[in-house]
């Protein structure tokens, strides 16, 4: 079932070799099938109960992912925990939290019949990270906590003690406050600070940052984060750098989704392109440049879509009155450099 061009009921299967791992006379080891998956196997996670495991699979042509909970040895259908386009950020349920099991092996972190998930929480308003719990009996999910607008906060640690869930640790930052660690408790709005790291670059706090949304000529919604120098005055047109990275999508609905957060702390290091903001440039960072189509033909319109995305970003900055359309550069890292070439 490994040939993607051939029809197959199941493309992969997970096998197990039992201890004491004695080889047959011909030198082979006997392996037994544990579970089969319809698409190509992508991952395997264990629970503390050895009779249950979680598999993930991926359909390359549709760019579709599924996560399933299996009862080993059961003839029943597995419980679907996730079933979505891998490019649909708004529907991403987050990653399953793991914990060291009784034998030192990482297993899914369970509590009260459910598994914890942490994710970016992408939305039309930007990323709002969350902590949720998914019922492993029904598949239903309940959000336990979500980052509020005005800050950017991600879950970094859950209690390691099995059977206990009374607090969790997050990494909290904002436009003006550097990342620090805090302890939160479910159901309570406040938090207890763990660290108090100072601002390492206070001279950068005046940099202006905002999310910009606009459309490509074909109607595909695009977005970018616009950075302006601290001393920028309304109506002043600056040289512009558009920094982007082309990504492939099957449809426009997922291509136009917003990601990232303007509430993150700005910190510059290395050869960051954002240093240009301190030199009087406007920078459109993370300008979306989707290449939409099926896997077989999307490259036929690659250059046209790439150029259209860059033009839309430049036009948007010019319409805002912050960029001089005659002084523009387009660049990006790795694959993003293709944008500069065209």
Name each model feature, range by range.
Residues 7-23, 136-137, 293-308:
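C-terminal/domain-terminus segments
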Residues 119-120, 131:
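A cross-family structural signal marking well-folded subdomains
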Residues 11-28, 67-74, 130-139, 183-186:
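Beta-propeller blade signature
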Residues 1-17, 29-119, 147-171, 200-213, ...:
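Conserved beta-propeller blade repeats
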Residues 156-340:
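Serine-hydrolase catalytic core recognition
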Residues 139-149:
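Non-catalytic extracellular/periplasmic "stalk"
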Residues 126-130, 329-331:
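Long, heptad-repeat coiled-coil alpha-helices that serve as cytosolic signaling/dimerization stalks
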């Amino acid at each position: 079932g490994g040939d993607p061009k051939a029809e197959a009921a199941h493309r992969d299967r997970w096998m197990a070799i039992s201890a004491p791992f004695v080889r047959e006379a011909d030198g082979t080891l006997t392996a037994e099938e544990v579970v089969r998956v319809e698409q190509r196997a992508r991952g395997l996670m264990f629970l503390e109960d050895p009779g249950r495991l979680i598999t993930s699979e991926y359909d390359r042509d549709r760019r579709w992912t599924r996560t399933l909970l299996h009862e080993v040895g059961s003839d029943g259908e597995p419980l679907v925990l996730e079933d979505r386009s891998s490019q649909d950020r708004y529907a991403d349920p987050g990653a399953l939290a793991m914990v060291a099991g009784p034998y030192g092996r990482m297993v899914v972190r369970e509590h009260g019949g459910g598994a914890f998930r942490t994710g970016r929480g992408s939305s039309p308003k930007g990323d709002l990270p969350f902590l949720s719990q998914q019922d492993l009996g029904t598949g239903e999910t309940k959000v336990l906590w979500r980052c509020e607008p005005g800050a950017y906060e991600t879950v970094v640690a859950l209690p390691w003690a099995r059977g206990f869930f009374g607090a969790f640790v997050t990494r909290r930052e904002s436009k003006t406050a550097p990342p620090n660690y805090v302890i939160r408790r479910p159901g309570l709005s406040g938090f207890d600070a763990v660290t108090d790291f100072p601002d390492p670059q206070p001279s950068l706090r005046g940099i202006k940052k905002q999310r910009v949304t606009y459309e490509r000529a074909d109607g595909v919604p695009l977005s970018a984060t616009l950075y302006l120098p601290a001393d920028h005055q309304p109506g002043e047109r600056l040289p512009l750098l558009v920094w982007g990275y082309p990504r492939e999508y099957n449809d426009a609905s997922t291509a136009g989704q917003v990601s990232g957060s303007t509430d993150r702390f700005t910190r510059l290091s290395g050869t960051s392109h954002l240093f240009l903001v301190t030199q009087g440039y406007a920078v459109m960072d993370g300008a979306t440049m989707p290449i939409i189509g099926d896997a077989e033909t999307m490259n036929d319109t690659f250059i046209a879509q790439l150029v259209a995305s860059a033009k839309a970003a430049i036009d948007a900055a010019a319409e805002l009155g912050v960029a001089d359309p005659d002084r523009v550069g387009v660049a990006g890292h790795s694959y993003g450099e293709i944008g500069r070439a065209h």
